[in-house]
A protein has these predicted regions:
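Bacterial N-terminal signal peptides that target proteins for export
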Residues: 2-12
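Sec-dependent N-terminal signal peptides
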Residues: 11-19
């Protein structure tokens, strides 16, 4: 185990690298480095890894000019964790990113930071909000980047939340090409992330029509075409030859293998075996194939080693370049970790160790597979080969202990409520702080995980009524899954069944008192059923924990207004509007309160703002008409009244 990566050691190493005479002499010849990460792409869909589906002609051509690692493995089947491993060269046990919402500690070595300190221009261009540091995800990933282009936005009225959180590869590529074209007078490091193979699968034409029955495959074919467009541009600009291009998937997709529909739970080859290739400058070692085990944790050290430099001591991966030079390398172990089952469902986490053809999975029901004779990991040999399993278990425990030594304090702040909603829109069960773990084996609950995935998408798409029977089945099977109770409450609430929503929402709050969104929805349902005092108490708790949560504060204020506390209501509405001047309901309520109080001049700007913010609200136009009448503006009042009537008629 290498020593922790201290700030001072990093500074010394970087200074030595920058000041090295050999490096300085070759500075003008330093290659550009492009890292392309393909989200959710299985290894067995690559032509260069044996697929006959014809999905990846561009990647296959690139592979023929580079080095292919036939047995490359991810360290986690989930986007932020795997990308943290790729970019830091450390295992999740060290870098501390274990799930959504965790922050990357500043003391962990970071490839962009290292290259930037050596004079590289650095740019990141990502296809999903999952990797956007500014939206509650991937905090700390911006370190070392001159440009971090994510470009995601708050959901617009009438827009599906999913549409505000991801973008087509062609859109991201447009920003990439613009940035690359601006890089003059020095080498650049580009990280280009493509999200399009991720579910919900929504490939564009003509790929949708080419693969009508397999939208996942269509998404991969589209991603391949985008990679081809980038390569064509590099060639047209004379950049291709002196550019090192690394292509890797962060993880794969189960597609029903072992019962898992997508990814994030299991650690089998469907999600852990990933494509990995390197196109070296000058096409060195073109066409070479490496059969030895490689891991994504090895990628950052490899890129640094390719520059003739020694990776920082805290990087735990090992350069893959010796595997290219040595046709008979030693067998390398590969570790994978799955914490999502624990963080989101309260089940047991999974950890696996792969050594040669043997795969051991530490779980409540341990697993052992001989992948040489059983590549699909269908036959668990744990009982028949207990001695082998025990030996691998000891090695795994030793490995985990070693890579955990010197790890910085984990920064697990968790996600805010809006971020959890965004995750749900992408089909993830939104998770916050670690749930109390049980010894439930995820293998025994994978149907629950699948059902929860489907439920989250159904709710996002407005199909709440259809998903209620499914969620009732889930909570009957495992009532301790907090997200299932929450989704059931949401489904009832959005169908106007507020009374039925209250019990599952109460259970959700009981299971996770820190789950503020569950408490918010519970408060709304209590309000709708007339229990204003209890609802107010819940909103007060929310505002105390999240003072900037405008909707919670507005709801609290609206109860105050209804229960004879107008001063407190007005005070909190003003706080809402200080942070969010265009908050429609706060403007409307405050304006109406001031109007009813007879302070017409004070009411006017709030009512006019409400109409400006939501021009299709008949209620807002009607209230503004009342206001104009009191101010003696008869013509304006008539116009507003007419518009209110028109809107009311058009919605019938």
């Amino acid at each position: 185990m290498q020593a922790p990566f201290s700030f001072m050691r990093r500074a010394i190493i970087l200074c030595l690298l920058v000041l090295s005479p050999a490096l300085a002499a070759a500075a003008t010849d330093r290659p550009n480095i492009i890292l392309i990460t393909l989200d959710t792409v299985r290894a067995d869909r690559m032509g260069f890894l044996g697929s006959k589906l014809g999905l990846t002609p561009q990647l296959d051509a690139l592979a023929s000019q580079g080095v292919v690692f036939e047995h490359a493995y991810s360290q986690a089947p989930i986007t932020p964790v795997s990308h943290a491993t790729i970019l830091t060269g450390t295992f999740p046990q060290f870098h501390g990113i274990r799930n959504f919402g965790d922050r990357l500690p500043p003391s962990v070595p970071f490839l962009p930071d290292i290259l930037h300190a050596q004079g590289y221009h650095t740019g990141a261009f990502v296809g999903s909000i999952i990797l956007d540091p500014k939206n509650g995800f991937a905090s700390g990933f911006e370190r070392g980047f001159d440009v971090y282009n994510a470009g995601f936005h708050r959901q617009k009225t009438g827009e599906r939340r999913e549409a505000s959180m991801q973008r087509r590869g062609e859109v991201t590529l447009g920003y990439v090409l613009e940035w690359v074209g601006q890089q003059k007078g020095g080498p650049f490091f580009l990280w280009f992330h493509l999200w399009d193979a991720h579910d919900p699968y929504n490939p564009p034409e003509p790929f949708r029509s080419r693969f009508p029955n397999t939208p996942y495959n269509a998404g991969i074919a589209y991603v391949d075409s985008i990679v081809g467009n980038l390569l064509d541009y590099l060639r047209s600009q004379g950049l291709y030859n002196n550019t090192l291009i690394a292509v890797a998937a962060d993880h794969g997709e189960s597609l029903g293998d072992h019962g898992e529909l997508t990814h994030s739970i299991f650690l089998y080859d469907s999600t852990i075996h990933v494509p990995l290739l390197l196109k070296l400058p000058g096409n060195r070692s073109a066409g070479q194939r490496v059969s030895a085990t490689a891991s994504l944790v090895d990628l950052a050290p490899t890129l640094i080693d390719s520059l003739g430099q020694t990776p920082p001591p805290a990087m735990q991966g090992r350069s893959l370049l010796p595997l290219i030079a040595n046709p008979h390398p030693e067998s390398r172990p590969s570790l994978a970790t799955g914490d999502h089952s624990e963080r989101s469902f309260g089940w047991s986490a999974l950890v696996s160790l792969r050594l040669g053809n043997q795969l051991y999975v530490r779980a409540p029901k341990p697993e052992l597979y001989d992948l040489a004779s059983d590549p699909g990991a269908k036959t668990n040999l744990y009982t028949d080969k207990r001695a082998v399993a025990v030996r691998l278990a000891v090695q795994l425990d030793s490995f985990v202990k070693q890579i955990s030594e010197g790890a910085p304090q984990s920064l697990q702040d968790g996600l805010d409520e809006k971020s959890r909603e965004k995750l749900s829109a992408l089909g993830y069960v939104a998770s916050g702080k670690t749930s109390p773990s049980t010894r439930i084996d995820p293998k025994d609950r994978i149907d629950v995980a699948n059902d929860m995935h489907d439920a989250s998408l159904a709710i996002e798409e407005g199909r709440e009524a259809t998903v209620i029977p499914l969620l009732l089945h889930v909570v009957a099977k495992d009532p301790q899954v907090q997200a299932a109770q929450y989704y059931l409450g949401i489904a009832y609430s959005r169908n106007g069944k507020f009374g039925k929503a209250i019990p599952p929402l109460r259970k959700a709050v009981e299971l996770r008192p820190d789950a503020l969104m569950a408490q918010y929805e519970l408060a709304i349902c209590l309000y709708e059923t007339g229990d204003l005092n209890t609802a107010a108490t819940h909103f007060e708790i929310l505002v105390e924990n999240r003072p900037d949560w405008s909707d919670a504060r507005y709801s609290m204020a609206s109860i105050y207004a209804r229960t004879g506390r107008p001063e407190e209501a007005a005070k909190n509405l003003l706080i809402v509007l200080q942070g969010e001047p265009d908050h429609y309901r706060a403007n409307l309520l405050l304006g109406r309160m001031l109007f009813l109080n007879g302070t017409f001049d004070e009411a006017l700007p709030y009512l006019e703002k409400a109409v400006a913010v939501q021009a299709d609200s008949g209620e807002a136009h009607s209230f503004l008409a009342d206001e104009y009448e009191k101010l003696g503006r008869a013509a304006d009042a008539a116009n507003e009244r007419a518009e209110a009537t028109r809107l009311k008629t058009s919605t019938r």
